[in-house]
């Protein structure tokens, strides 16, 4: 009976650990949704570039953070997507309730930051969408080194003209 009880306790502990790890690992669907949101709704690539290297779209000033070299942890990344970056940067806040009472950002409200509040986004995001973008950035961009042709094809699709030019050594 003692062995059975010990086995049940060990199994319960293993299942708890496995579910904890699974909860921290983004699902493939979350990453796919995050990619679509990064590309289309949030238009992150306009400033951060398709590869997240901070180069931006050809029409952007290219002054955004290089996400490939980011040292932000998950919670910090979520807060920046949700709240933007105060202080006159172009990084918008994607949570429409950010900076309000009860939804403080970086421990501050809109009254605390005044005219240094981040700009409004072109489209707001829901919590699930913010989580999905963070999952995509963490899975496909952060710590991945310089962008490759394979990265380009994963982002734009196989046969993309941009990726063909990248493969030929031309500027993106």
Residue ranges of model-derived segments:
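Sec/Tat signal peptide C-region and signal peptidase I cleavage site
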Residues: 19-23
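Positively charged n-region of N-terminal signal peptides that target proteins for export
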Residues: 1-4
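Flexible coil segments in periplasmic/lumen-exposed cytochrome c-class electron-transfer proteins
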Residues: 26-32, 41-42, 89-172
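Sequence/structural segment immediately N-terminal to covalent heme-attachment motifs in c-type
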Residues: 28-50, 83
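Bacterial N-terminal signal peptides
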Residues: 7-18
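Gly/Gly-Pro-rich "capping" loops immediately C-terminal to redox-active cysteine motifs
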Residues: 51-86, 90-115, 119
């Amino acid at each position: 009976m003692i062995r059975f009880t010990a086995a049940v306790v060990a199994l319960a502990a293993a299942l708890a650990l496995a579910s904890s790890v699974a909860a921290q690992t983004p699902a493939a669907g979350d990453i796919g949704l995050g990619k679509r949101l990064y590309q289309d709704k949030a238009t992150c690539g306009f400033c951060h570039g398709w590869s997240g290297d901070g180069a931006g779209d050809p029409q952007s000033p290219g002054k955004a953070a290089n996400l490939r070299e980011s040292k932000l942890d998950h919670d910090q990344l979520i807060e920046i997507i949700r709240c933007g970056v105060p202080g006159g940067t172009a990084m918008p806040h994607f949570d429409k309730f950010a900076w309000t009472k009860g939804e403080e950002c970086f421990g501050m409200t809109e009254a605390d930051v005044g005219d240094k509040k981040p700009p409004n986004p072109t489209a707001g995001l829901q919590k699930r969408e913010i989580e999905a973008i963070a999952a995509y950035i963490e899975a496909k961009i952060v710590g991945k080194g310089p962008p490759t042709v394979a990265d380009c094809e994963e982002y734009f699709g196989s046969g993309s003209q941009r990726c063909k030019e990248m493969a030929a050594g031309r500027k993106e």
